[in-house]
């Protein structure tokens, strides 16, 4: 981290914004935290550096602006603070709100209005108890009692997270976690006795009150003590909620029900052994919260929510899911704008036919799931190789899981090494730790390259032009039923779980993925979905919702010459893209 600290120091002397994104390449979180100040440490107007603070400069500039551009996370923080305190002071006053990519708002709102607590939540309190360095001396605790409180609070906080880890499946505690993120739902009120942690947090607030009471308002030490007291109170409320589960999954009414879970993240990190444990909680129904806090915000003249994938498909039925999730008022005006693209001329949808002999993407009951998944992914890789040949490279392949991506990448690289791909085609893979930005730039620059990636390349990625002449989808991107939030939403929906929650979420994700294909009026691209559940012809396991899936991505399901033509013939991809067939006998 020493080199990163030096880079930050040099950059800090010249930056005009203070935004971390300016640092290229990036720096470690540890180095950034060593040089940055969190909101808990900020002494506000009492800071001697107030006049040169980048955060205050940005806030002051926004207050004077006619138009303010921010992100959804900051908007939701503004709404939450307004709801909790009655004062909306995160953003300057506004009377018209335009939300882009509004399809992302519900899940981000669940996170913003939910609960997240990792071991790091205690660090700010422990830092204050430890005392800051003064005059080059060692750390000096604010009061004589702080050292004892620190010792016992740290011990009991560690015990809380150890108890959480003990509830995880045994596989999460082994050496074969392989970077996975695992979850366990909390549904037993009183599963842990948090009284000890609560006791020491109350003691923190008592000591903080002593310090704040002995200083003048605005004094930096007074502000730090007040911030510490607020943070301790936040942790107390979180611990109480997580251990008592007041809203449970059984007793609460649907509109106020919340789900709680423990998350174990096994991603490798420097200076860390074992998984990172995080407690999370989220409301199931977020629509009522958004209806009150967003659409019903006092002083607003208009709210405009826009997205290329706001609805789940054409027709009035496509608005059912977004209306409920976004809390859109009944009297709001909704408008689905036709696409500016000529999909009938510019694109092609390729789905499995009987000749593809695709196995089921879902393991039969009682079958070995791992072996079944490997068999399906191997079949997908075969189709992907045919797609790459038909498109002469120029393919973005999106996979629904890390395991499928890894296996498919191995098979595609093997085929490339054996000379089974067109000469000069470069294979790029989104491997753990790989820079998404660098992969995206390389894919765009190398027109005939192939990129195998996960969901992050299915959204917010603009590969316009010839470089993305084919989009390959290995499997319909249904959400994981193992995700605690998804499990809670499906349980709350009862017998209607598939049509109410599961299918709409898949359709929205798939629409995003397919949207990578055609970005301008001059683009020409094919979309290949390898999942036989949307296939055509006898012997293909197409589902009753196959037509809904095709309609959602703009396909010509009624054969009227409007929308993407549908075919099971990969050779039509060559014709669409103007790629010559290989010589007879060539692979």
Stretch-by-stretch model annotation:
Residues 528-587:
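N-terminal targeting/trafficking signals and adjacent low-complexity tails
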Residues 355-400:
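Conserved interdomain hinge at the start of the Helicase C-terminal
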Residues 304-308, 393-400, 529-530:
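Conserved RecA-like ASCE P-loop NTPase motor core of nucleic-acid helicases/translocases
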Residues 352-374, 431-535:
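Conserved RecA-like P-loop NTPase helicase motor core
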Residues 102-103, 107-185:
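Conserved phosphoryl-transfer catalytic core
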Residues 32-68, 76-88, 211-347, 351-353, ...:
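A contiguous, basic/glycine-rich beta-loop/short-helix subdomain that forms a polymer-engagement track
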